[in-house]
Amino acid sequence: MQAGHEGAGREQSFGVNIHLPFEQQANRFIRNDPKLVAFHFFFTRKLIFVKEADAFVFFPGGFGTQDEAAEVLTLLQTGKTQMVPILMLDLPNNGYWREWDDFVRRRMLGAGYISEEDLSLFKMVENVEEAVKEIQHFYSNYQSLRFVKRDMVVRLVHPPTPSLIAELNRDFRDILTGGEIRETAALPEEADEQAAWSLHRLLVPFNRRNFGRLRNMIDVINGPR
């Protein structure tokens, strides 16, 4: 968390700490700041940092790192939080996340505990520059989504072309509940989000189940790197 605070600067940062009888102290970039919040329970701390984050970059760590990574992946897998990029950043010649990825594929996927599409919820990266490019690409066109009644509204920076809409309807029909993906104006139910009012939109009859496939769809919406 210190790296995030250092990069953003104190004015643009907030901290979510945990009360422990040992080890845990706020880093010097956020220490004594009124935007530093200390929690008694890990689950409330995770709830807050997941709610406010636009991306997650996980570095090698201990049980806490594994706990947070599993929490975020589970929330995305089940649609309980906004779709965001999740990146596993390995240190040079370390292989920490490569070994984790191998375990996930052999033990979880191999035993049928997760689906093939769930592997799309995270990406492996080798350095900071690669992580930055992945995050920038994720938001190069896609911005956010919102469920309105039975449909999902996907907000975009650029207007969707007819060829893109046709491609999405062809390649992602397996996650549609009926009807087709189409362009739409902002819906009345979105009036409480004025900051997103001017964005372009797709109306998607998403089945609310295959969130790994939804992550694949976002990659297509953003186009080639």
What role is predicted for each listed range?
Residues 81-93, 118-120, 148:
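Short loop-to-beta-strand entry elements in the cores of soluble alpha/beta enzymes
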Residues 2, 94-107:
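Glycine-rich, charge-decorated loop segments at or immediately adjacent to ligand/cofactor-binding or catalytic sites
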Residues 121, 128-225:
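SAM-dependent methyltransferases
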Residues 1-59:
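Acidic/glycine-enriched connector segments
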Residues 20-25, 65, 93-97:
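Short gly/pro/ser/thr-enriched loop/turn and capping motifs at secondary-structure boundaries
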Residues 35-44, 120-131:
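Short acidic-hydrophobic, aromatic-tinged amphipathic segments that line or gate anion-handling sites
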Residues 38-87, 143:
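Active-site/ligand-binding-proximal alpha/beta "capping" segment
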Residues 47-58, 107-126:
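Conserved thiamine diphosphate
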